[in-house]
């Protein structure tokens, strides 16, 4: 299995499973759409190496530059300031990836369609999005009022198909725990609230692995 340098990422396992499925390797070109803090870009850059290329894409120039600096230690990096709905790359890539992006955009279908158009024929699109209200803290449903589409993960396989992609695999995974540990730490970082000893089931993360048709 591909080993990613994401030791503190409680959602790393479904990403590793997805990358194993598509065979990410040295020399690939990939786009991290909505790259955020850059942990995933940096980890994947280590795999594609100096012969590969990373497109670090974010609507926030500061976040984009942070990602580019992190990934540049391992691969060629092109930093682009773009919203997902406006995604346009200078060349086709082997993989377009996003995680925790579609819940915030205006139109998830437009972003997925753009991602599909950004990859080469038979290229890969990997998307990971939550079903926020399926998460629980002490048995109480979680919410994310600031998100436009907090449960977009539940629609993800259908959205991928409507974007013209061929869905190869789709599944959901939810980290869970009680008391001190990575799950509680992740929730505290996300919300600013320590759950203490309450049982926590984080929002299931739906992963879709899809391909652009020939």
Can you say where each PLM-predicted feature lies in the sequence?
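A short glycine-rich, Lys/Arg-flanked "PGG" loop and its adjoining helix->strand segment in the class I
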Residues: 109-124
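Conserved Class I S-adenosyl-L-methionine
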Residues: 154, 166-214
């Amino acid at each position: 299995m591909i080993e990613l340098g994401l030791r503190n990422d409680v959602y790393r396992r479904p990403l590793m499973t997805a990358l194993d499925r598509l065979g990410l390797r040295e020399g690939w070109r990939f786009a991290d759409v909505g790259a955020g803090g850059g942990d995933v870009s940096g980890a994947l850059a280590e795999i594609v190496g100096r012969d590969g290329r990373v497109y670090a894409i974010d609507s926030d120039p500061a976040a984009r530059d942070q990602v580019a600096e992190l990934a540049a230690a391992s691969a060629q990096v092109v930093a682009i300031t773009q919203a997902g709905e406006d995604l346009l790359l200078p060349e086709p890539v082997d993989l377009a990836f996003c995680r925790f992006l579609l819940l915030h955009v205006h139109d998830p279908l437009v972003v997925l369609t753009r991602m599909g158009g950004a990859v080469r024929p038979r290229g890969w699109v990997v998307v990971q999005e939550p079903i926020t209200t399926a998460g629980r803290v002490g048995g109480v449903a979680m919410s994310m009022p600031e998100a436009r589409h907090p449960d977009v993960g539940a629609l993800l396989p259908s959205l991928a198909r409507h974007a013209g992609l061929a869905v190869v695999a789709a599944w959901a995974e939810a980290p869970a725990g009680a008391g001190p540990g990575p799950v509680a730490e992740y929730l505290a970082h996300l919300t600013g609230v320590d759950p203490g000893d309450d049982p926590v089931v984080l929002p299931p993360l739906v992963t879709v692995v899809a391909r652009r048709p020939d």
